[in-house]
A protein has these predicted regions:
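Single-stranded RNA-binding regions, centering on S1/OB-family and related RNA-binding modules
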Residues: 1-243
Length: 243
């Protein structure tokens, strides 16, 4: 056996050992965000959507980390990946002493600190400003490992009164908005509704019952047909038929 064949056989044997060890090791899963350390690289190898960074196995994507001899991340389709500066929509899930816990549809709950409100709020009576179940249009101002902090200190942010909230795949949001807002303005004008689109895929619609339903159906059409050509024409036709 020549040297090249011997090296090839050794590589195959090493790969087989790693594969068998991975199968035999009991694997665990946990939700991770990009940049999060999953485990030490001392006893593990990076797999899909992970990397070795300074001796640690680190996640490259949002998803479920599967931890065995080889560590990989299974991406979760359609999950919202928060970024600083995003304007998003969420619902108050809990009222704390120093702020509100907001469900924004991501892997972690977000927090709106009391000091990020644009006006004075009595910390002993915070539910007068926002209570559990209230919908809010907020901005992401900080993203750290395992936490997202929000703010209301920008124009157009605040509590969303009445209406309905629907949810779409956040990756389809640009198609719903359209170039320079053309698509969403088309729907607003036709249905006579107020619409706020959150970059997390939550969309608030307010108008007459008929208008809200029609707007919701139009947005559902966009989500279904987002990969196809002639989308604007299809939406115009749909809206025209519903008059």
């Amino acid at each position: 056996m020549d040297k090249e064949e011997k090296n090839t056989q050794t590589d195959v044997e090493e790969t087989k050992e790693v594969s068998e060890a991975d199968v035999q090791t009991k694997k665990e899963r946990k939700l991770v965000v990009p940049g999060e350390t999953i485990v030490s690289a001392d006893d593990h190898l990076p797999g899909d959507y992970t990397r070795n960074e300074d001796g640690d196995i680190v996640a490259n994507r949002y998803g479920l980390a599967e931890i065995g001899k080889i560590v990989k991340v299974i991406p979760i389709s359609g999950i919202y990946e928060p970024r600083r500066g995003n304007t998003i929509i969420g619902r108050v899930e809990d009222v704390m002493f120093s702020g509100w816990v907001i469900d924004v549809g991501g892997p972690y709950r977000a927090f709106l600190p009391l000091m990020e409100c644009p006006r004075f709020v009595d910390k002993f009576n915070m539910t007068e400003f926002a209570n559990v179940g209230d919908a809010m249009n907020v901005k992401v101002w900080s993203v750290k490992k395992g936490s997202v902090d929000l703010s209301l200190k920008s124009r157009g942010l605040g509590k969303l009164e009445g209406g309905r909230i629907i949810r779409i795949n956040p990756h389809k949001v640009p198609r719903v908005i359209g170039k320079e807002g053309s698509m969403i303005n088309l729907i607003k004008d036709d249905t006579q509704t107020e619409i706020t689109v959150g970059q997390n895929g939550y969309i608030w619609i307010k108008g007459s019952e008929e208008g809200e339903r029609k707007a919701e159906d139009a947005i559902a059409l966009i989500e279904r047909e987002s990969a196809n050509d002639g989308l604007t024409g299809k939406v115009e036709k749909f809206l025209g038929e519903k008059k």
